[in-house]
Amino acid sequence: MKNKNSEQNTHSTIGEQDIHYFHEGKHIYAYEFMGAHKACEEGIEGIRFTTWAPNAKSICVIGDFNYWQVEDKNYMEPITDAGLWSVFIPNAKNGDKYKFVVTNKDTNNYVYKSDPYAFFSELRPNTASIITTETQYTWSDDKWLEKRAKTNYYDNPMNVYELHLASWKTKNGKFLTYDELNETLPQYIKEMGYTHVEFMPLHEHPLDASWGYQPTGFYSVNSRHGDIIGLKRLVDKLHNNDIGVILDWVPGHFCKDQHGLIYFDGSPCYEYQEPTKAINKGWGTHNFDLGRNEVKCFLISNAMYWINEFHIDGLRVDAVSNILYLNYDREDGQWIPNIYGGHENLEGIAFLKELNGVLKHTCKGVITIAEESSSWPDISTPVEKGGLGFDFKWNMGWMNDTLRYISLDPVYRKYHHNLITFSMVYHYSEKFILSISHDEVVHGKKSLINKMWGDLWNKYAGLRLYMSYMIGHPGKKLIFMGSEFVQFVEWREYEQLQWQVVDQYESHKQTLHFFKKLNDLYHNETALWQCDYDHHGFRWIDADNSQQSILSFIRSSKDNKQKLIFICNFTPVTYYDYHLGVPDAGSYKEVFNSDNLEFGGSGQVMATEIFSSPQSSHGFEQRITIKIPPMATLVLKLIK
């Protein structure tokens, strides 16, 4: 089995070892020989096409090189009894469009299929694959990759900006190319202080409204924005600006458009044989057969492809619950229990462990993140310790609870105080990322600003309060594009964000400035990220003040030299002479206040130092007395 770190191999020979590992489900570089590859055979240059179709009677390659005609010389030959087919076509070349005509051995019916391993495809509504052999790129991110390999992300800052390339910005209503995005995106991410960008899926998909989560071309770069080299340049530029790149990846299911993977050889092939397991009615897709060796090779090799060829730093694995549970989104009677009578998908569990094991072994510094909405245990526990092996898990519970809380009238918040504190009960059970993602600002859920309670002033104040509380809460961070400058309408994938409001309204400009300053605070204060998953890094001062809806807690660095005190007031009431217990005697300085005038607040800031006094409060021997502004978060730091 070949083992390479970057750039596609143009050597087309399919060795016995490749074939063996492919059918055993252990080949992690299948894209090196599957699909269309440049070849020179008996002194003649051309393209070798290889595909897997175990129930095919015949497969013919048609395309620009033969005027889309079925010809005897372009029929593939079976090279194994388990469904590998291949043919060398001399006059095929880079840039030619092509498809496979696959005839089923039982029905004699034929289907026109795109190449599952194609590196590039036509833009919808066209569906042909495109021979792509010119993919070499000279990278300049060696320093980034060296640093990545040595980085422990658990005790380093991670502040992720999630975005959908097609709607971040457009040009005269048209998609920006990767090269056009290269001119503005890296600089914007860097100036705003985010450490990573998370791209929603970049593989080819026919329906814009699916946002990429119903793919057909798993190996094909999204053609809406350009070609392979353009995407590599964009990632390279991001890395050279010290910005990591995370990719949303969809290994659980696939689009059922007829040119894609569905019934690839005229019968279940990439999907499960049993319709109850294969058909995903909720999403209108088909689920991958994760117990089939060749399908596992397809998917794990795909993960390796994005990491090796595009230097992707992490994969956010979509819809993990759909992989883990046989009864996910299914009523009783619509699913078949496993061999032990349970609802766990044993094949899905084994696949996720194998995926994470392979990436840990071969891709130093690359992370995996689970989007998983149930309470499945040990998702971010290493495989060797009995877990699934992910590095992180999105904290969907925190997101649901806190967004519900922040939408309540402050009069009633005291009755639901547990919504804002409960997350710390289970926080250390997983390596959580606090995520406010695209899913929370679509389908009638309202934009983030419109989730906030009250009139316009209170909405803005509530947003600043909430985001400051989020920065202080243990766990890495993620926010969806548009929230940082207060987009009032829900996200729409068919148009660009409302960037014009930043120039038109001072409140939007002030909030954008707030996010930048908040991100600066996060990046500069070790206490906010060094002990996210260590009990030492967080301590409540007062978690029980439900009557006033005030939270207070301490964040600490490993060496205890840096301590930050957060006070979050979730009511529109100013509290004067508020006594707060503190861990150390000395003077404290306000280092952040979400009520600052420059952010659009009322300007109730503390310009002078605050000295502690030897009076017991909240279980501490020292206390300070402060004024807490309305709907605001204060951050204090011990300075001496």
Curated annotation (Swiss-Prot):
Pathway assigned in UniProt: Glycan biosynthesis; glycogen biosynthesis
Keywords: Carbohydrate metabolism, Glycogen biosynthesis, Glycogen metabolism, Glycosyltransferase, Transferase
Keyword Glycosyltransferase: yes
E.C. number(s) listed in UniProt: 2.4.1.18
BP-aspect Gene Ontology terms: glycogen biosynthetic process
Database matches in InterPro entries: A-amylase/branching_C (IPR006048), Branching_enzy (IPR037439), GlgB (IPR006407), GlgB_N_E_set_prok (IPR044143), Glyco_hydro_13_cat_dom (IPR006047), Glyco_hydro_13_N (IPR004193), Glyco_hydro_b (IPR013780), Glycoside_hydrolase_SF (IPR017853)
Gene3D superfamilies: Glycosidases, Golgi alpha-mannosidase II, Immunoglobulins
Reactions mediated catalytically: Transfers a segment of a (1->4)-alpha-D-glucan chain to a primary hydroxy group in a similar glucan chain
Pfam families to which the protein is assigned, alphabetical: Alpha-amylase, Alpha-amylase_C, CBM_48
Cleavable signal peptide: none
Active-site residues per Swiss-Prot or TrEMBL entry: D318, E371
GO function term, MF aspect, one: 1,4-alpha-glucan branching enzyme activity
Keyword Methyltransferase attached: no
Entry's family note: Belongs to the glycosyl hydrolase 13 family. GlgB subfamily.
UniProt-listed NCBIfam families: branching_enzym, PRK05402.1, PRK12313.1
HAMAP family for this protein: GlgB
Subunit structure: Monomer.
Annotated protein name in UniProt: 1,4-alpha-glucan branching enzyme GlgB
Protein species of origin: Francisella tularensis subsp. mediasiatica (strain FSC147)
Top-level taxonomy: Bacteria, Pseudomonadati, Pseudomonadota, Gammaproteobacteria, Thiotrichales
Chain's gene name: glgB
